[in-house]
Amino acid sequence: MYQAKKMLLLGSGELGKEVVIEAQRLGVVTVAVDSYEHAPAMQAAHKSYVIDMLDKAQVREVIEKEKPDLIVPEVEAIATDELLKLEEEGFHVIPNARAAKLTMDREGIRRLAAETLHLPTAGYEFANTYEEFKEAAETIGFPCVVKPLMSSSGKGQSVCRSASGLKSCWDMAMEGGRVKNGRVIVEEFIPFESEITLLTVRAANGTSFCAPIGHEQKDGDYIESWQPHHMTEQQIKEAKHIAKSITDELGGYGLFGVELFLTEDKVYFSEVSPRPHDTGLVTLVTQNLSEFALHVRAVLGFPIPEITQLSPGASRPLKAPKELADYAVEGLEKALAVKSTQVRVFGKPVTKVGRRMAVALSAAETVEEARERAAEALSHLSIT
């Protein structure tokens, strides 16, 4: 009988769904775990479990029961201390349990980047209470960026422009974090020209990079991404240096989403996630190997050949305007009539305000044209 490897995903969103599909293409048995039923990756996986992923006993129970060859965290909010123990007992966490723990919140990774590796970052302060937060904002100065230490898809992030906005920014951070009433980071506001994601792959045959992905954020969540993003040779050199430094320090195999700010004369490190990145959905139409295929190859220990850009492309996510228990994605016929365009509907069981429900992906001969096509496709889509 075929001796398949088994991969267990902790977190089963739309990015996890693509990872599951790529893993199955290489004969891997997949187990999808999340905190709610019918999550996107569960719809494609061989098996699924619903647990509280911040509960170490539940995480341990499902891992000991399934005995996976690979544990693949797909979100930040996991009982990472338990992953450290499981790793010591012989389980294989991707890329490793330390990286999962460091990137679980913004403090560990920011201190590592700025204080250990001395990479260029925005100035920052941390705060546990509203009083500390006010002091931190005064120290950093206005405008400043406020983020919960642990959140996903930009939830709870805001830009505070004056002292009068402090209370609302604090409340937003408290509400948006994965851990309610948690710690926050207050960052210097960098007047950047653009934000990019440099997808960085650590594999058996070394480190490789995808072409830079430009993206636009609104309320801390991405509303558009495109590839390639134009950068000078010097900017690309600096970006690769930062990405290699941070991913080498984290170690292990897999794809990392390294977020960077570009100013006229400098590249700043912002964040890193040791897994496929939402802005990287665009690679489904731009590259010979998508970010998901690259991640799966790397974590299985396979080499990564040359990553080829097949075409410029762009992505636009469809977000839910309100909460619905029953919903439909309308306008697919018109959206799919747009040239060189695909739509991926994620199949989430219910909508929430601002929740990503689908994505329009367009290719074209130029980035500008791809962005126009993706915008047109998105304009036809709605949730009812």
From Swiss-Prot:
ATP binds at residues 106, 147, 152-157, 187-190, 195. It comes from the Bacteria. N(1)-(5-phospho-beta-D-ribosyl)glycinamide binds at residues 14-15, 74, 278, 348, 355-356. InterPro entries: ATP-grasp, ATP-grasp_carboxylate-amine, ATP_grasp_subdomain_1, PreATP-grasp_dom_sf, PurT, PurT/PurK_preATP-grasp, PurT_C, Rudment_hybrid_motif. It is an enzyme of class 6 (ligase). Mg(2+) binds at residues 259, 271. The keyword Ligase applies. GO terms for molecular function: ATP binding; magnesium ion binding; phosphoribosylglycinamide formyltransferase 2 activity; phosphoribosylglycinamide formyltransferase activity. The keyword Metal-binding applies. Homodimer. Belongs to the PurK/PurT family. Involved in the de novo purine biosynthesis. Catalyzes the transfer of formate to 5-phospho-ribosyl-glycinamide (GAR), producing 5-phospho-ribosyl-N-formylglycinamide (FGAR). Formate is provided by PurU via hydrolysis of 10-formyl-tetrahydrofolate. This is Formate-dependent phosphoribosylglycinamide formyltransferase. It comes from Bacillus velezensis (strain DSM 23117 / BGSC 10A6 / LMG 26770 / FZB42) (Bacillus amyloliquefaciens subsp. plantarum). The lineage of its organism: Bacteria, Bacillati, Bacillota, Bacilli, Bacillales.
